[in-house]
Design a protein with these regions (language model features):
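Walker A/P-loop phosphate-binding motif and the immediately C-terminal alpha-helix
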Residues: 1-30, 149
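Residue-level signature of catalytic and energy-coupling elements of molecular machines
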Residues: 4, 30, 38, 68, ...
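Short acidic, glycine/serine/threonine-rich loops at helix termini
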Residues: 11, 39-41, 79-81, 120, ...
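Short amphipathic alpha-helical face segments that pack within enzyme cores
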Residues: 14, 33, 87-91, 147
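Conserved, well-folded catalytic cores of nucleic-acid-processing
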Residues: 22, 40-45, 71, 94-102, ...
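Phosphate-binding loop that captures ATP/GTP phosphates
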Residues: 22-77, 89
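Phosphate-binding/switch loop-helix module in NTP-utilizing enzymes
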Residues: 72-122
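Conserved catalytic-core segment of NTP-binding enzymes
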Residues: 105-167
Length: 167
């Protein structure tokens, strides 16, 4: 979705849990670097990702879902991230290329709102099979979500569906 506060992170977690319950190997990459909420939604906010000089190992939830988020590597989750676009997109790329995800059937990427640097970087550098948009039943929100749908289509990424949340 192009808009914040519509439930993208919550839907990402719910989809990941459902896929894991069906026996799939699932990972969640929290690409919302300036507003990461995935660790809290999985109740792993006190956990920390560990790593070596070569790789970062994601935190695994009780459901067996592998999770990588900036809040799993910073000391305190309420630290402000005051970085420019290139630094943020660099972290997102690192979470894709430098994290040992192992064998996954699905990697769910929780995106920040908008059609800016991070969504563009993700769509250009990660082999995405499709996107699911999350919206709420408000005209202004629908217009903003349409921009994200158009962006995905311009990037030749299939829109698998739209979840209308809070309806």
């Amino acid at each position: 979705s192009g808009k914040g506060g519509v439930g993208k992170s919550t839907m990402s977690v719910m989809i990941a849990k459902e896929l894991a319950a069906r026996g799939y190997q699932v990972g969640v990459l929290d690409a919302d670097i300036t507003g990461p909420s995935i660790p809290r939604l999985f109740h792993i906010e006190n956990e920390r990702a560990r790593g070596t000089e070569q790789l970062i190992y994601p935190v695994e939830t009780v459901e067996g879902i592998k999770v990588m988020s900036l809040n799993l590597v910073v000391e305190k989750e309420d630290e402000a991230v005051i970085w420019r676009g290139p630094a943020i997109t660099g972290i997102v790329n690192q979470f894709w290329t430098g994290v040992y995800w192992g064998e996954l059937d699905y990697l769910i990427i929780d995106m920040p709102p908008g059609t800016g640097d991070v969504p563009l970087t993700v769509m250009q550098s990660i082999p995405i099979k499709g996107v699911v948009m999350v919206s709420i039943p408000q005209d202004m929100i629908s217009m903003i979500v349409s921009k994200s749908i158009n962006m995905a289509r311009k990037m030749n990424i299939e829109v698998l569906g739209v979840i209308e949340n809070m309806s």
